[in-house]
Amino acid sequence: MRVRIALLGLSGVGKSTLIGRLRQSVQIVHLQASALIKAEQAYRAQDADSSEALRIGAVMDNQDLIIAAYRREAQATALPIIFDGHNVIDGRDGLVEIPAYVFRALDLDAICYLSADPEWIAERRQMDASRARPVRDAVTLAEHQRIAYSAAERIAEEIGCRFVVIADDKVDQLIELVG
């Protein structure tokens, strides 16, 4: 049986870093939401948007692109899949919660929520010049993390999959889930 896990968390919390560590121990397919959107835009012969344009653009339209690209990638592999994405987007007009139907369409076994100290997240975001992200202080990030955590837990319950909190970059929790 193929394992499908969504690893969610704020931008800059370390999702891709944690998945990189997981890949040192377990063979998986790592599907990033932004890469899936760009791949689907290319597949449909649309101009690919920058990561910043994806964040502030038509967030809900992008979810359909994610679902289509994810399903195509999932059909092509028997390996465990880790979906690296967000359930709450810090968009142009504030926080946008991604509806449960998007995660249901990914046929997930578990939703993992990666949390970290908001001060640390703020520092990571400032040091990462490769991505355009909104500048947020630790207090704001703490509130965003609380909202995203609650939404992830609610989505997992709504779609009937396991909810796992991963704190402090604990790769062993993911290894256990991937099995």
What does each model-identified segment do?
Residues 10:
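P-loop (Walker A) phosphate-binding loop of NTP-binding proteins
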Residues 85-128:
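ATP-dependent NMP and nucleoside kinases share a basic, alpha-helical "lid"
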Residues 24-31:
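Post-Walker A helix-loop "phosphate-sensing" segment adjacent to the P-loop in P-loop NTPases
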Residues 14:
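Conserved glycine(s) of the Walker
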Residues 33-96:
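ATP-dependent small-molecule kinase phosphotransfer cores
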Residues 127-173:
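Small-molecule kinase domains that catalyze NTP-dependent phosphoryl transfer to phosphate-bearing small molecules
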Residues 7:
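Hydrophobic anchor at the beta1->P-loop junction of P-loop NTPases
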Residues 18:
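Hydrophobic positions on the alpha1 helix immediately C-terminal to the Walker A/P-loop
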